[in-house]
A protein has these predicted regions:
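Short glycine-/aliphatic-rich beta-strand segments at the starts of folded cytosolic domains
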Residues: 3-20
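Short, surface-exposed beta-edge/turn micro-motifs
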Residues: 8-10, 51-54
Length: 104
């Protein structure tokens, strides 16, 4: 039987401060809520980092738990977009920034 690679989801987040600190806060809260084994299964990783925006990835099976951990961390982090590929995530992020400039 073939072993399939697990599916991933990419999340674009806005945070205050360093992106490494935000990722560590997400991982720490995830461990507190669901345990270290679940945190390893979630495979939360930093893909790209910017000044206030970052892209993180996690496994699809653990996505809901990751979103709960993001919601419950302090300082708060906002999830802008979510996608299965980085290319589509960039498009959605661009749509978000276009919409934000139209509103302002």
């Amino acid at each position: 039987m073939l072993r399939r690679r697990s599916k991933r989801r990419y999340l674009s987040i806005i945070h205050a401060g360093e992106s490494i600190a935000s990722l560590n806060a997400i991982t720490k809260r995830f461990c507190e809520l669901f345990g270290t084994i679940a945190a390893e299964k979630a495979a939360i990783r930093l893909v790209r980092q910017g000044t206030n925006e970052s892209i993180i990835k996690c496994r699809l099976d653990e996505l809901e738990k990751v979103l709960v951990a993001i919601t419950l961390i302090d300082p708060p982090v906002v999830t802008i977009a979510m996608s299965g590929s980085i290319r589509q995530l960039r498009r959605r992020r661009q749509q978000y920034s276009d919409l934000k400039t139209r509103v302002i």
